């Protein structure tokens, strides 16, 4: 009897594997990648999904099948932030199947990444919204967008994608992302849940989501920096106590009445003290100059918060994302690592995106990944200079509350050396949800070492820090990231 059962199971698995080979669109299969000399550890696909055929509005994706068991492993959507930054950032610099190394004599650019998230999951890297990366529309009006439209368009993409890859419809599905994806992820999750209630087909087997160093709430995020700088030993006890006193412990007011002149002065002193540091990881050197910090928002003119609709967003190349801003503000995409950059347009410091930019603009690479030619849609930028983006959804706290109370699992993780979206803000808002603590603050382990700290709450909410990591956690701590990612997807204790 046992052998009969084993034979039946083997037959089912073989059938599933055959289905994967048969069902996935052959035209999307990637057969080679310039810079890589070897055999892919799993199948890769890329191409466009039309989310509005009439307008020729298309989102581009890169899909990596799991290296373990694609037929049953979770499908995970990855979204980088910005707003307006390509998710190929995650592919190239964080947790993709390859490590990109500067080309040396007689060597190749791409090498297999032992800590790729495709070791344990199928993963979709999506360029969203339209106008980002290789995604495009024939109607330039589509490059003016907002949180609500982005969530709706990405949900449409998912429905169409699962029709193209029907063999994955029964797999557990998770949404993940970092930085401004702290907005993208919960708003998209809410759309997916709404689709469930409306019995939208195909039904997406949504189980939960992960957010790394994510923008969440204007006030919580805005108040996070001063405690972070003090806790990290970046400002003196005296300056911290003086700032705390004159600001009454509140360093950002959400654009209501502002702060006092005395408070603004102390905040500027804090800003001046830390502004030579790498915003995205205070342990790392800063390569491209410096930037003022987020604290400057309190004493800069509010009139600088918006761009006029006729003003083209700045064509600057940058890598990171980050801080929330007042509801309704029109944003220069990709320029949100600090309020001062948002308002004054300084560009993003300390970051080098040369490898991704050169590789993805190589005509042979674009052809290999089924992306439009440069003459058709322009050059690939890590963060788009084509968008006008409006933040229109406000705080994400109620989104998280609704999702977790509905039974969906949530992991909020933070690199503890990120000064862009400090862990202090994420720790504060997860605690403010008011859920019962079911797993008290403790270290979590990776490779027999303390990798960070975690606290678990009722209703499937977990907060996690990663020791020594910056804004883009898997970039700095790849082994540890694969560990917590694997455990979360499997429903195991981290």
Curated annotation (Swiss-Prot):
Enzyme class, UniProt record, top EC level: hydrolase
Glycosylation sites noted in the Swiss-Prot or TrEMBL record: 37, 69, 198, 248, 402, 460
One example GO MF annotation: serine-type carboxypeptidase activity
Keywords, in A-Z order: Carboxypeptidase, Disulfide bond, Glycoprotein, Hydrolase, Protease, Secreted, Signal
Compartments it resides in: Secreted
Disulphide connectivity of cysteines: 85-383, 247-263, 286-350
Example GO biological process: proteolysis
Tissue-by-tissue expression: Expressed in flowers and siliques.
Gene Ontology, cellular component aspect: extracellular region
Primary subcellular site in the record, as a coarse category: secreted
Span of the signal peptide: 1-23
Residue positions of the active site: 179, 418, 471
Name of protein: Serine carboxypeptidase-like 21
Species, as recorded: Arabidopsis thaliana (Mouse-ear cress)
